[in-house]
A protein has these predicted regions:
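PP2C/PPM-type serine/threonine phosphatase catalytic domain
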Residues: 1-377
């Protein structure tokens, strides 16, 4: 199988998981180091997607990578939710299968891969934003942003600071200093799916060691009012509390847009706390739950067989790889797993502003999939 085919297989697995999973709710992972919360508001569909991933390479010399990412499907275009699914799953698969050494370059290449995938599918009529922060086990930190989703850093001494720039016409024309820009100035000039000319540049995070939280927010979250948004983040006791409060306020004031928060605690032991049983392990966490992938290659070995295995061919595509190099996806276990402590409490739909402010913990399903690439010798 070619490298491109291998990446497409990982992308389709993540994309299917997101597409068929729940879209609204919240999840915490890594002993409180990662929090994702998403609310539909009064919209018919939640077109926001957010995930946390980390991958351990099969090659020992390559560092492990962790990343938190958010995509907001553009509702005024075709298939906003599907565009967000395709954008974030392509970004994730490109990031974890990329071979370039520098983290910043891998983020840029993964962003361009997502852009081209969405453009090819929707021909410029569908799109999404993208905000992501990533780190490696060697201590590298980098971020990237396209569109008007935002990336903030929270440092106790300095409060909340936006480190991304909204890709709007208003910002491009900021030198005009218009007192109250008309709505057309707030339109996006860059988005995932626009095709050629994206030219996304990574954001350097040289002082990452001073950061407490990296905060990713869709526009439905931060537009509740800048002072209110900043006040909630700055005065919340925990990151999850902050995320849920922002989404609740968004719903209380009308819920005119989806609201999604994804927060990464920089102090979390993202790599030492995760000890996968197999090399090549990829973990993806999102509102649907937790997806575990084991990705590795085998040469001249027969297909794995198991009476309980759910084995199927890779999805057919027009540009499918040549025959003779089969790929097996084996569903090796389905079990309930969660970092939340209460495994009996039901999930609460946080899009309902009249519900109790106490957000009950709940358990999400974990799907373990082993992807084995079998090559002829």
């Amino acid at each position: 199988m070619t490298a491109g085919g291998y990446q497409r297989l990982v992308q389709s697995t993540i994309g299917d998981w997101l597409r068929h999973g729940k879209k609204t709710g919240f999840i915490s992972a890594d002993s409180g180091g990662v929090h994702i919360a998403s609310s539909k508001g009064n919209r018919d569909e939640n077109q926001d997607r957010a995930i946390f991933l980390r991958v351990q390479s099969t090659i020992r010399e390559r560092p492990s990578i962790a990343c938190i990412a958010l995509c907001d499907g553009m509702g005024g275009m075709q298939s906003g939710g599907a565009s967000a699914d395709l954008a974030i799953s392509t970004f994730a698969s490109s990031l974890v299968t990329g071979k370039n050494g520098r983290l910043a370059e891998r983020l840029e290449l993964a962003t361009e891969a997502a852009n081209q995938a969405v453009h090819q599918e929707y021909k410029g009529k569908g799109g999404a934003t993208l905000a992501a922060v990533a780190c490696s086990s060697t201590g590298e930190w980098s971020a990237i942003n396209v569109g008007d989703s935002r990336i903030y850093t929270f440092i106790s001494a300095n409060g909340l600071r936006q480190i991304s720039t909204d890709d709007t016409l208003e910002n491009m024309l900021s030198d005009l200093r218009l007192p109250s820009p008309s709505p057309e100035f707030r339109k996006l000039v860059r988005f995932i799916g626009m095709g050629d000319g994206l030219d996304a540049q990574s954001i350097a995070l040289g002082q990452a060691q001073e950061v407490i939280w990296f905060v990713l927010a869709s526009d439905g979250a931060y537009t509740i009012s800048e002072p209110v948004f900043r006040g909630i983040i700055s005065h919340s006791e925990t990151a999850l509390d902050a995320a849920l409060k922002v989404n609740d306020v968004s719903a209380w004031i009308g819920g005119s847009d989806n609201s999604t928060m994804a927060i990464l605690d920089r102090r979390a032991s993202l790599f030492t706390s995760w000890q996968p049983s197999k090399a090549g392990s990829l973990q993806v966490v999102g509102v649907p739950g937790s997806l575990q992938l084991v990705i590795h290659s085998e040469i001249s070995r027969p297909m794995l067989s198991s009476p309980r295995a759910d084995t199927r061919k890779a999805p057919r595509r027009k540009d499918r790889d040549k025959p003779g190099r089969p790929t097996q996806i084996t569903d090796i276990s389905r079990e309930v797993a969660s970092s939340n402590v209460n495994d009996r409490a039901p999930a609460r739909d946080i899009s309902n502003p009249s519900a109790n402010l106490v957000h009950d913990n709940y358990v999400e399903p974990r799907l373990d999939i082993e992807i084995t690439e079998c090559e002829e010798s």
